């Protein structure tokens, strides 16, 4: 594709050099550039892409998109833009033939519930006869093709290439988790969304966004900017959780019609006659399209919110209510979301991705509602991430568990002991017993907590001290099959470790 054609997707401030040249590929990493490539000089947190323009040119780049002016060799075209990330997103979409322009695309954003809602909506769309691709935290997938997910939402060039591949493979709809980082960094600016879904907003990622206001503002971009109707997609819709305290702000900012969901008064998509049990959720959908009974094997009030989000998104896509019901009833399990791990000790072993205070509270509240005996929670907090949530998670785990085992998560470049101490700071004011590891299980007679740095040892301790009827929750890593120590990923899967811990007991 010629550079001149790509430039029609943006409004450059200045173009120095010829634009009638063929572009062989788009690159934001100078190490990946091939001859004939177009290089985007992105300003990042750790490095400034302008420093690598020379390397890109040496590798054969014939044009550069940048925010700062600077000398370039003769024969190289320089395109100056106000925002290189936005330009890259729009030009990437053009380069790959705007794959979502004529393909239903749903973007789901929020602190918690994104992954579960994508799985549910995928099931609904499949029931409606639309082969559906999903891009999210767990993986990127379509039918039998499954790819690892390096990011919840890929960088725009990678995203548009993936979307083109999915469209060419036969996908008739795409459901995508949209992270706050992706919205802030303009990765999805080249996407043509049909529906945007807001699940909720609670404290997370403040290591990046710094304030909750900034975190909310990143989420609102989807609804305030990227859902504006156009001739290609004139019937865009926003789906918003009206139960969430931030819902009104999202509704007010939305530039398209809004469908609300929730259990509170005024929600357009809601549920009545709801019952929660160890076997799942039953109730009656109440929607603008009518009423319909439903049942789901999923557990807990927070999953009812995810079910309503998926149902509302289905209605926004004008899918039949019966297809929505069938999709929800047929969906069984999201990897690493209250996932049951079998054992022969009569213990309920659950693995969940809950890694924020709110998510952990939701999961433990659900478990408490179905528990007949003690709850033991094994959890930690990620390193090089928002430290402010650590004492919050400590307090939540200790309050809602009978025993909280504080351990390591993905410490990254932080000292695990320091992270655990910050978690402990949220527990100590509760006045609970602090056990020493060597005291357990003999001294385990009442609510308390214990610190065990090794996650593997912490899981094995939990397996040793529980009895039939107890529930063990391994929280924080969910579907992840790795642990990041320093800058290295080591294989570690809570599901595997939990199963092994119980097997070793004989």
Identify what each model region corresponds to.
Residues 62-68, 237-242, 378-379, 402-410:
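Short internal beta-strands
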Residues 49-62, 78-87, 194-199, 215-220, ...:
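A short, gly/pro- and small-residue-rich
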Residues 1-12, 35-38, 289, 299, ...:
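ATP-dependent carboxylate-amine ligase
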Residues 88-242, 248-254, 308, 370-371:
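Phosphate-binding loop of NTP-binding sites
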Residues 46-52, 185-186, 207-214, 386-389, ...:
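Glycine/threonine-rich flexible loop motifs
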Residues 1-90, 94, 245, 267, ...:
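N-terminal leader/targeting and accessory segments in enzymes
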Residues 7, 71-75, 184, 195-349, ...:
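Acidic, Mg2+-coordinating active-site environments of NTP-dependent enzymes
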Residues 66-69, 178, 200, 408, ...:
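Short secondary-structure boundary segments
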């Amino acid at each position: 594709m010629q550079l001149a054609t790509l430039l029609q997707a943006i409004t450059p401030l200045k173009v120095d050099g010829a634009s009638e040249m063929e572009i062989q590929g788009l690159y934001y990493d100078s190490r990946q550039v091939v001859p004939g490539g177009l290089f985007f000089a992105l300003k990042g947190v750790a490095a400034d892409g302008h420093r690598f323009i020379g390397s890109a040119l040496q590798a054969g780049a014939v044009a550069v998109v940048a925010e700062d002016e600077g000398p370039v060799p003769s024969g190289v075209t320089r395109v100056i833009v106000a925002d290189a990330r936005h330009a890259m997103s729009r030009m990437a979409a053009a380069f790959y033939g705007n794959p979502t322009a004529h393909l239903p695309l749903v973007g789901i954003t929020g602190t918690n519930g994104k992954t579960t809602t994508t799985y549910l909506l995928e099931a609904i769309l499949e029931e409606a006869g639309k082969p559906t691709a999903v891009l999210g935290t767990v993986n990127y997938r379509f039918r039998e093709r499954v790819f690892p997910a390096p990011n919840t939402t890929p960088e725009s060039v990678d995203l548009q290439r993936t979307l083109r591949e999915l469209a060419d493979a036969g996908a008739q709809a795409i459901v995508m988790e949209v992270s706050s980082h992706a919205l802030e960094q303009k990765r999805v600016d080249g996407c043509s969304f049909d529906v945007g879904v807001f699940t909720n907003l609670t404290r997370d990622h403040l290591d990046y966004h710094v304030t909750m206001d900034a975190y909310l503002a990143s989420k609102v971009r989807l609804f305030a900017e990227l859902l504006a109707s156009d001739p290609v997609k004139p019937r865009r819709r926003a789906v918003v959780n009206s139960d969430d305290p931030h819902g009104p702000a999202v509704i007010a900012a939305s530039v398209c019609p809004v469908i609300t969901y929730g259990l509170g008064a005024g929600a357009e998509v809601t549920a009545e006659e709801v019952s929660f049990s160890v076997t799942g959720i039953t109730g009656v959908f109440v929607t603008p399209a009518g009423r319909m009974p439903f049942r789901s094997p999923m557990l807990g009030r927070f999953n009812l919110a995810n079910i309503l989000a998926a149902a509302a998104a289905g209605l926004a896509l004008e899918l039949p209510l019966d297809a929505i019901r069938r999709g929800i009833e047929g969906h069984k399990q999201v990897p690493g979301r209250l996932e049951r791990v079998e054992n022969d000790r009569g213990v309920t072993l659950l693995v969940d991705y809950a890694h924020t205070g709110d998510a952990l509270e939701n999961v433990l509240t659900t478990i408490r509602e179905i528990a007949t005996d003690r709850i033991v929670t094994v959890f930690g907090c990620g390193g090089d991430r928002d430290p402010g949530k650590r004492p919050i998670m400590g307090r939540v785990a200790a309050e809602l568990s009978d025993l909280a085992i504080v351990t390591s998560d993905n410490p990254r470049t932080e000292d695990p002991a320091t992270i655990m101490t910050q978690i402990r700071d949220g527990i100590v004011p509760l006045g609970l017993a602090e056990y020493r590891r060597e005291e357990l299980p003999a001294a385990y007679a009442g609510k308390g907590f214990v610190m065990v740095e090794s996650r593997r040892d912490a899981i094995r301790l939990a397996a040793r001290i529980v009895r039939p009827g107890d529930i063990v929750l391994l929280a924080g890593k969910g579907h992840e099959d790795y642990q990041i120590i320093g800058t290295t990923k080591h294989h570690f899967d809570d599901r595997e470790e939990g199963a092994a811990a119980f097997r070793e007991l004989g």
